[in-house]
Structures are given as C-alpha cells and as structure tokens.
C-alpha cells in the first residue's frame, strides 16, 4: 500500500467527517408557511382547551411605603412603656395643654387651673388659680404660647398671661359657654378669642384683652351646638364643627370673618367634609399638623380621620371602635381576658357619661405622626406609612384621655446654642438633651401622668415613688378619717392561726391604710374565724377570706367593695406575699391570698398589703394539699382558726 501524502490524508479525513455534520440549509418559503400554519393551529387548540379566565402577566409587588428618617423622628418622641411621674389636683383632671413657651397647664373638674414649667428633666410647679366657681368646659392656648384662656359654667372667661403666669382679664359672657379658642396670629392688632354658646350654634368673637362686648357674632354659621373650634395659624383660618357633623372654614378680624381665600375649594361638595354627617357622627377633637396641611380628627364614632386642609379631601381613616378591638382580641390576644373585659367596661362607661368628648388627638413636631389615647394605651401612628409604630402605657391601669406633647429642649439657657458650641467638647453643653414628654389625663383620676424616654425607677425607697403627693387632704377628709379611724384600728403585724399551723405576717398600714384597716378590723371582729382555704393552686397561691367558701362571697368592713391601693414599693416580686383577691379594678372585699412564688403579672391588679415573716413551711404545706382539679378546692378542708392582730 502506497504511502499517502500529508495533504491527501487531511482531505480524506475531511471527507469522512463531512457527512456527520448537519447541512446548514435555509427553509423554503413554502416550508415556512406550513410551519407558521401548524403553529397557529396549535395555539388555537391550546386556546380552545383553556377553560376559565386567562392567566394575566404577574404584576410587580407594590413597594411598601417607607418614611425617610423615621427612626430619627421616633427618637424625638417618648418611648417608655410606663409613666415616669404623676402629679395631683384636688379633683378629676379634665384638660391639659402644652405651650410653645414651655409651660404645661392643667385644669380640673372643680374649676382649678395649675401652671407647670418644663425644665431640662421633668417639670416644676409654678402657680395655682381658682379659675372658675364651677366646671371648666374648655381651655385654649394661643399659637405662640403667650395667652391662655378658660371658660366655665359660671358664664365667665378668664384670660392669663402664660409667661408671667398671671390673670390679666375676666370676661362676663352672659351665657353658658361650650368651646373656646384663640383665633389671632402673631402680628395681629387684636388678640381675638372665640367662644361658643353651649346650647346653640352661635360663636362670639371677643378681644381677649378688651371688654365684654363681642366684636362679631356668627349666628347662622352653625345650627347645632359646637364641638370644636381650632385655629390653623399657618393658613390663618379657623375650622369649627358641630354636633350635626358639619365642618366650616372661616377667618378672624384681619380678613373680616370671611371664607378663607387660600384653600382649593369653593363648594363643600368638592370635598370630603360631609364625611361626618354621612356617618351620623361629629368631630370630638380637631388638630392641625405644624405645616398646616393636615387636619386630624377623632369622631364620636371612634374613628380617626385625617384630611388635607387645602383640598378638604380625606387622607386616612383609622377605626378605633370597640367592635374593632373585640375582633382584634379574638384574632390575636392583646390583653388577658379578664383585663380586656375590665377595660371594655371602662369604655362603655366612657360612652355612658359622654366622656368620649374629652379624648383628643395631637400631631408631633414633624407632622408625620399622630398620637391619641385608646383602651390599649397611647397609640403613635405614622400617617405616611399607615402603621402603628408604638403603644405607650399598655400595661398601666389608666385610661388615657387628653394628651399634650412637649418636644425639644426646655428654654432655660438665655443664649442660643451656636454651631461652635455644638461642635465643642464641652461636657456641660453635651448634657443638654431633648426631653420629649407626653402629659396626659386619665378617666376619673385626679392625677396627670408623664411619659418620657425614661422608665420609672423601681427602687424600694419611698422618695423615688413616681406618684407624687403634692396635694394635702382637705379638712373634711381629715375630719372624716379621724372620726372613722380610732388609733388602734390598724396594726403592722398579725398571726394567722390555721388548722395546719401558724403564719406570722408583716402588714403595711402606711402604704395601703384602707386595705390593712379592713383586714385588721375583720380579724379583731372574728370575721375570718372558720373560713376555709377555698382555692389552692400548687406552685401559685392559697386563697381564703370568703365566708361562703365558694369564692363569690365576702364584703369589706364598710359594706360592699373598696378601691385598690397600689404602691410602687410593694410588688409581687417574691413568694409569701399577702394580696387582695378581686373581680376587677376597685372590687376589694374580704378575700385575700398568699403567693408561694413570685407573681409579677399581678402587679397593679391586686393590692399587696403584707408579707409572711415566719411560717413559710405552713404556707407550703397548705399549697401542696390534694385539690379538685376542676374547682381548685381541697378535698379535706384547711381552715383559719382565728387571726391575732398585735
């Protein structure tokens, strides 16, 4: 076989490989037409086979709204879950306001007004006025914080200079007033103030520094009694609302009381301001954002509505009705069932006595957040992202009503802080920090409460008590207490003699005098003799004090029930604690229990009035007896023989 040349070998290899490669030929026009027809037939068949709605192209998921710098804004709001401090009036506090001049003003049901000054940390008392002889109906502070006024059912208006905390004028109105509001802006010639007649829709405009003669009367603007009058200082316009759900815009003396020209509507039908009338509700609180562009309202139907001021269009609606809270509790438990039931009872009482009208709403300094009180506590709502970002005071035993918000630094230093001062490393200047504070009133309480960024101190010293007793008891209260209480009605120790041994206890008559008095008098009278420990839960507590032995009986020495006496130094933080059994807030009778473990979840729900000092093993033995698993009642009775009060 002849040898092949290199080129011949390469050609032969190429020829052998060529058949294996596919031919790259183009489809003819006829073949292309056939292929398209087949493809169309397949598509038609697929369409015929498809039953139901056609699949749509997947839509892009909506991007969640985010408020830029939200964390910074929230840092300038109170964040503590419990109130730091509380102060007293003689009677139930109904109103509270905070001024731009760093004053906090509180008013109580008996016509008294108190001025407090915001300092770097906390507040200090300034002055006390007996402003009205009767009930205070409404209070108002001017937009720049210089003037304050109050109206009461003594048919009078009192005007105060805030900075100098002095009463400067008194107007005799000649009618029962309902609402009041300063309607002047800085620079106006007249310090005009508006007051409404309680039983009609009339609005009277006065010179706050002048006499009793009104400058102007709106007698046809509203046909029903007014519920709110509020000034928007940015747009120099006033918004008023009445019980028929109507909302009106108007101006003060500089614009001759006419309709404002700086809004983008002429007819109310172009707005959403008929929303309240459509829902058969009316605003009980109105406030404006710092830039004046948003109006926040709370309605009598417990819905929070936020409008745009210029257009009158509805922006947000938050449902805070009782039915919504009930559904929320059923979906995801917010509170223990017993506590939820107690708070619902308070809400129904609020509606019964028409106290819902005292609940207000406020904006923060940025206008991005609204704050208002609910049965769960103080809600902080981000109106831009539509989310509840914080709830304050959820574990407190108070129903928050009116709020006043202080933000920033109290203006104690006369010289302004310069850029150089801020950049310096001066430790004195660095200590000057903002102290955001919410000051709030509570339903049927003669105290106002302060929520800050600081949690309350939980020390055992009486000096660190967060509830400040800044009011002395009246002569009548002292007389009643002296007559009712003999010198030996209370004691600081007692021995409970049981069928299983003696339990020595220490009592706290100073911290909870009424509870200890009830226990001591019952004990001396032999009331507890023969009572069984009718409820025993191993690893929890032993309960007694019911003459019926069912857990449903017993009463106090005064007959019926008496109020709770919570004290910050007396907690369920250790075993062998004596505490009152109850069926809810302020329902103490004669039943009490002794814990065998720490039970902190009972704090501010049951009154601690004593501790076991000797005989802990007796308590343990009683807690270990066999009981009916359904009723927690022991199979063999363990009873109190008698109680010796020393």
Swiss-Prot record:
It comes from the Eukaryota. It is found in: Nucleus. Residues 17-30, 455-478 have a biased composition (Basic and acidic residues). Residues 1-30, 455-490 are annotated as: Disordered. GO terms for cellular component: catalytic step 2 spliceosome; nuclear body; nucleoplasm. WD repeats lie at residues 80-118, 124-162, 168-208, 213-252, 271-309, 345-386, 401-453. PROSITE patterns: CSA_PPIASE_2, WD_REPEATS_2, WD_REPEATS_REGION. SUPFAM superfamilies: Cyclophilin-like, WD40 repeat-like. Its EC number is 5.2.1.8. It catalyses: [protein]-peptidylproline (omega=180) = [protein]-peptidylproline (omega=0). InterPro entries: Cyclophilin-like_dom_sf (IPR029000), Cyclophilin-type_PPIase_dom (IPR002130), Cyclophilin_A-like (IPR044666), WD40/YVTN_repeat-like_dom_sf (IPR015943), WD40_repeat_dom_sf (IPR036322), WD40_rpt (IPR001680). Disulfide bonds: none annotated. PPIase that catalyzes the cis-trans isomerization of proline imidic peptide bonds in oligopeptides and may therefore assist protein folding. May be involved in pre-mRNA splicing. Identified in the spliceosome C complex. This is Peptidylprolyl isomerase domain and WD repeat-containing protein 1. It comes from Homo sapiens.
